């Protein structure tokens, strides 16, 4: 079963080396099962079949040629293209003609592939509409049907309709969808909520986890595990009963905890890290260590400037994408340099809070079904995780949660991810009060709360504010009795989004909120995106609670 495992170590004598090559690193457990960890695309009868391989694996040197030549400004465009004929025939044709003197790569691609459509570009908003009316009219624009794709593309089939974020993101995304669902519920779109509930349950049943998104190149990783929060929303909104999802929650939990039983202290496998005291915490991970299909050229360039083995950098870039915070100072050794990324060496506060929620949800639903042993087991797991988080990720001196660098055995940076323990009910009241003071003094602006207090040029840092962080902060602080702060964040965010909407007549992915003048957020690997799923969802929910700004 084991390819490599440390024999009879004494944890007290182990000194952690930060930058050992992964293949030789004794603190990274290697199990044979990891080779088979990535699932294959599933077919659904009556729907177009996806390609069995990712675009990079399918088109090989053609893929690298297209990406290196920068035929498209966005590296995601080619992976999202659909072939006009059998993909293998396209590759054979390319190999026959690529060395011809008059070979034109751009024309070859245009002749053999359908370019992805950007549906939202067809939509023109009515300036007379209120913010609420605008959002309600956007839902159909952002809805995709199961049959809305061409055979052999990278798009994974789903059994029901789904919402996409918009812009370059023409597929559904895991954690985005939860925040989008908040708005669907407020808009009375229970039909779409049911469809999305069925889709996510189907993905867990067929893939063993919910992929980052429904693309073949996303199958090797997930995103922040918010399915337990979705189930809670389905129950509250009367869409689906929570009991029907107990097995799905257990399956997702097994995915995140895979290999835990084989670990010794100071050792990790996939998503799990066993801490020096034997407790278990989690990290973000991707089962591949190659450049991301959708950001291939950017990843290759980043690795060139890292001074590390490229596959190590690719893994950390992929894990950063799995975090949803792609990218942020949270994952960087040098906050000004993406090439210093070390995502897999950090224990994230938000991930472990979401997993606490997952453990608690399994316990609660097991109790409803009379499964007392399962309830007791998962209550114990949730309690153990909370204790470990308090031991390693709570900064008592400053009254904040922080990520933890498990390779250097020290606390990492403070960010708005620290509010997730409040949102899932993991903090005590003293922690909530102290964290509120820190957020007020370090992250709060007239436009909402910043992603972090560090200005790095990455999109999940200052000066940007993001809808999901506002929602979790608002609800988290109110849950612990700080209505004043929760309401202030809510009204500030509504003002930000509405002011921008009145000027530009659109909703966007992120907002620059550092100086009190709302404008387009920047940073990251791609241009700012319109749409935008989770902004619409959070704002629509807030309008239901606070009225139109």
UniProtKB/Swiss-Prot annotation:
This protein's pathway: Glycan degradation; trehalose degradation; D-glucose from alpha,alpha-trehalose: step 1/1
GO cellular component terms attached to this protein's record: cytoplasm
Coiled-coil regions, chain positions: none
The keyword Hydrolase appears for this protein: yes
InterPro entries according to UniProt: 6-hairpin_glycosidase_sf, 6hp_glycosidase-like_sf, Cyt_trehalase, Glyco_hydro_37, Glyco_hydro_37_CS
An example Gene Ontology molecular-function term: alpha,alpha-trehalase activity
Class of enzymatic activity (EC top level): hydrolase
GO biological process: cellular hyperosmotic response; trehalose catabolic process
EC number(s) stated in the UniProt entry for this protein: 3.2.1.28
UniProt binding sites for substrate: 168, 175-176, 212, 221-223, 292-294, 324, 525
Active site: 326 (proton donor/acceptor), 509 (proton donor/acceptor)
SUPFAM superfamilies: Six-hairpin glycosidases
Reaction equations catalysed: alpha,alpha-trehalose + H2O = alpha-D-glucose + beta-D-glucose
UniProt keyword terms in alphabetical order: Cytoplasm, Glycosidase, Hydrolase
PROSITE patterns for the chain: TREHALASE_1 (PS00927), TREHALASE_2 (PS00928)
Compartment(s): Cytoplasm
Quaternary structure (record): Monomer.
Family of this protein: Belongs to the glycosyl hydrolase 37 family.
Matches recorded under PANTHER family: CYTOPLASMIC TREHALASE, TREHALASE
Function of the protein: Hydrolyzes trehalose to glucose. Could be involved, in cells returning to low osmolarity conditions, in the utilization of the accumulated cytoplasmic trehalose, which was synthesized in response to high osmolarity.
The protein's name: Cytoplasmic trehalase
Lineage, top ranks: Bacteria, Pseudomonadati, Pseudomonadota, Gammaproteobacteria, Enterobacterales
């Amino acid at each position: 079963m084991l390819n490599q495992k440390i024999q009879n170590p004494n944890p007290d004598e182990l000194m952690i080396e930060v930058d050992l090559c992964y293949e030789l690193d004794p603190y990274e457990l290697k199990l044979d099962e990891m080779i088979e960890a990535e699932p294959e695309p599933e077919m659904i009868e009556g729907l177009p079949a996806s390609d069995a391989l990712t675009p990079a694996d399918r088109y090989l040197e053609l893929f690298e040629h297209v990406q290196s030549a920068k035929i498209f400004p966005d590296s995601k465009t080619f992976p999202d293209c659909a072939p006009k004929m059998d993909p293998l025939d396209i590759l054979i044709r390319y190999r026959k003609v690529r060395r011809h003197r008059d070979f034109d790569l751009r024309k070859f691609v245009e002749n053999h592939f359908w370019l992805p459509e950007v549906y939202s570009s067809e939509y023109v908003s009515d300036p007379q509409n209120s913010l609420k009316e605008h959002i309600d009219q956007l839902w159909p624009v952002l809805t995709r049907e199961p049959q809305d794709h061409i055979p052999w593309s990278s798009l994974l089939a789903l059994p029901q309709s789904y919402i996409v974020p918009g812009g370059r993101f023409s597929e559904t995304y895991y954690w985005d969808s939860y925040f989008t669902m908040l708005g669907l519920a407020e808009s009375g779109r229970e039909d779409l909520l049911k469809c999305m509930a069925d889709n996510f349950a189907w993905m867990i049943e067929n893939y063993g986890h919910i992929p980052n998104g429904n693309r073949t190149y996303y199958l090797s990783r997930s995103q922040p595990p918010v399915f337990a929060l979705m189930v809670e929303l389905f129950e509250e909104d009367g869409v689906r009963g929570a009991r029907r999802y107990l097995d799905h929650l257990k399956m997702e939990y097994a995915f995140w905890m895979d290999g835990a039983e084989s670990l010794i202290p100071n050792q990790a496998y996939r998503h799990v890290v066993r801490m020096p005291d034997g407790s278990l915490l989690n990290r973000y991970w991707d089962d591949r260590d190659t450049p991301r299909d959708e950001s291939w050229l950017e990843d290759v360039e980043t690795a060139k400037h890292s001074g590390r083995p490229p596959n190590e950098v690719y893994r950390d870039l992929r894990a950063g994408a799995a975090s949803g915070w792609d990218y942020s100072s949270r994952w960087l050794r040098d906050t000004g340099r993406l090439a210093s990324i070390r995502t897999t060496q950090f224990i994230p506060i938000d991930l472990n809070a979401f997993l606490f929620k997952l453990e608690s949800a399994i316990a609660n639903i097991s109790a409803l079904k009379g499964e007392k042993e399962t309830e007791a087991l998962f209550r114990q797991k949730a309690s153990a995780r909370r204790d470990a988080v308090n031991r390693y990720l709570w900064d008592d001196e400053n009254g904040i949660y922080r990520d933890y660098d498990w390779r250097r055995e020290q606390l990492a940076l403070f960010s708005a991810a620290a509010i997730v323990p409040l949102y899932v009910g993991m903090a005590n009241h003293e922690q909530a009060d102290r964290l509120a003071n820190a957020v007020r003094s370090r992250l709060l602006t007239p436009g909402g709360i910043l992603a972090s207090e560090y200005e790095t040029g990455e999109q999940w840092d200052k000066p940007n504010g993001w809808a999901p962080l506002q929602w979790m902060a608002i609800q988290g602080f109110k849950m612990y009795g700080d209505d004043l702060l929760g309401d202030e964040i809510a009204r500030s965010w509504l003002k930000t989004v509405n002011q921008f909407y009145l000027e530009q007549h659109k909703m966007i992915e992120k907002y620059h909120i550092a100086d009190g003048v709302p404008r387009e957020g920047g940073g990251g690997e791609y241009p700012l995106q319109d749409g935008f799923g989770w902004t619409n969802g959070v704002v629509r929910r807030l309008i239901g609670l606070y009225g139109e700004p």
